[in-house]
């Protein structure tokens, strides 16, 4: 297995580069070992994905956003050139800041994925693009969203991610668009579970919104779904990959306190108006995996079980030293 860091590489970065003009590229993701290009590999999902893909025997080129700016068409074509499959983890994820930087958010979340899709189509490489539950939310509902339900983002971040989905599928109809939600690792980063762990270690009560409901998703489980797609047997198109069940942020916070042995009664419910933000948040974006399962993607386990394992993994890792921070 090879894990190749993109830093300092040139167009000849593969350990076993393909000869110019060969015809062995594969858009179908049904072979055991693949050459995987990961964009946005410096982020929470990208880091775990790079490690797990290499552990499964794939040759991996892990590119941070500074090493491959997906808004740069030339850079994208250069790095995609010899890959069997590209997994796009690069995104503008600062939901509130996107309200003040809509052009930048659109460039990264819509133009960039379109560039990747066009480059992959040109060389017959597979493409897996990660999207979000925030493409939904404008409709008042309380039942999980299926892949073909009407979209309706309520903020600029969600609108740019929806535009990215459309750009990907327009340029490469056989791409995989994988929507996920409320992703966390729980270590030393700034995700919701990591934040709740830090607050649980302190004293006093905290107020957490109970009127935002979604699908908390553990990074490790999401990565498993992405690698299942690489392994083959999943139909292309839009898929949902989120841990099963329904949770509010309040529910997720209480469960995190319980998992670390803190008193969950310290977590108190409140409304979103208690914590006003520049970008509106959707009240309900639970993702259903039913159609995705029919397409061949194994549904992810219940969010509470995943959260317990995530916290246990963090505790085990910190016994020997802290986890790397995740931006």
Swiss-Prot record:
Reported cofactor(s): Mg(2+)
Protein origin, superkingdom: Bacteria
Protein name: dTDP-4-dehydrorhamnose reductase
Residues the record lists as binding dTDP-beta-L-rhamnose: 132-133, 182
Gene Ontology terms, MF aspect: dTDP-4-dehydrorhamnose reductase activity; metal ion binding
Reactions that this protein is recorded to catalyse: dTDP-beta-L-rhamnose + NADP(+) = dTDP-4-dehydro-beta-L-rhamnose + NADPH + H(+)
Residues marked Could provide a fine-tuning to achieve optimal pKa matching between active site and substrate (site): 132
Note on cofactor: Binds 1 Mg(2+) ion per monomer.
Gene assigned in the entry: rmlD
The family this protein is said to belong to: Belongs to the dTDP-4-dehydrorhamnose reductase family.
Record flagged with keyword NAD: yes
Assigned GO CC terms: cytosol
Source organism phylogeny: Bacteria, Bacillati, Actinomycetota, Actinomycetes, Mycobacteriales
Primary enzyme class: oxidoreductase
Protein species of origin: Mycolicibacterium smegmatis (strain ATCC 700084 / mc(2)155)
Enzyme Commission (EC) number: 1.1.1.133
Binding site for NADH: 43-45, 69-70, 91-93, 157, 161
UniProtKB keywords: Carbohydrate metabolism, Magnesium, Metal-binding, NAD, NADP, Oxidoreductase
Biased composition (Basic and acidic residues): 264-276
């Amino acid at each position: 297995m090879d894990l190749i860091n993109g830093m300092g590489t040139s167009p000849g970065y593969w350990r076993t580069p393909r000869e110019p003009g060969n015809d062995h590229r594969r858009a179908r993701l049904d072979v055991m070992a693949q050459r995987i290009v990961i964009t946005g590999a410096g982020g929470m999902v990208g880091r775990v994905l790079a490690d797990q893909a290499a552990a499964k025997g794939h040759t991996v080129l892990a590119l941070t956003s500074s090493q491959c700016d997906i808004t740069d068409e030339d850079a994208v074509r250069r790095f995609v050139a010899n890959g069997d499959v590209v997994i796009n983890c690069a995104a503008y994820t600062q939901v509130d800041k996107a309200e003040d930087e809509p052009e930048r958010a659109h460039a990264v979340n819509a133009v960039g994925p379109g560039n990747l899709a066009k480059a992959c189509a040109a060389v017959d490489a597979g493409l897996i693009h990660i999207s979000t539950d925030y493409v939904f939310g404008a409709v008042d509902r309380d039942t999980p969203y299926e892949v073909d339900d009407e979209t309706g983002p309520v903020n600029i971040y969600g609108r740019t991610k929806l535009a990215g989905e459309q750009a990907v599928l327009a340029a490469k109809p056989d791409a995989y668009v994988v929507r996920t939600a409320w992703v966390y690792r729980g270590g030393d980063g700034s995700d919701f579970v990591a934040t709740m762990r830090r607050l649980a270690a302190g004293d006093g009560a905290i107020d957490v919104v109970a009127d935002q409901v979604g699908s908390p998703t553990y990074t490790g489980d999401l990565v498993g779904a992405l690698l299942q797609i690489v392994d083959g047997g999943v139909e292309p198109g839009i898929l949902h990959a989120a841990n099963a069940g329904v949770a509010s942020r309040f529910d997720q916070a209480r469960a995190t306190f319980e998992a670390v042995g803190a008193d969950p009664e310290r977590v108190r419910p409140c409304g979103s108006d208690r914590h006003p933000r520049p970008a509106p948040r959707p009240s309900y974006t639970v993702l259903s995996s039913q159609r995705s399962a029919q397409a061949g993607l194994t549904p992810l386990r219940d969010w509470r079980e995943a959260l317990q394992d995530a916290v246990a993994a963090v505790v085990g890792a910190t016994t020997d030293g802290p986890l790397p921070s995740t931006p």
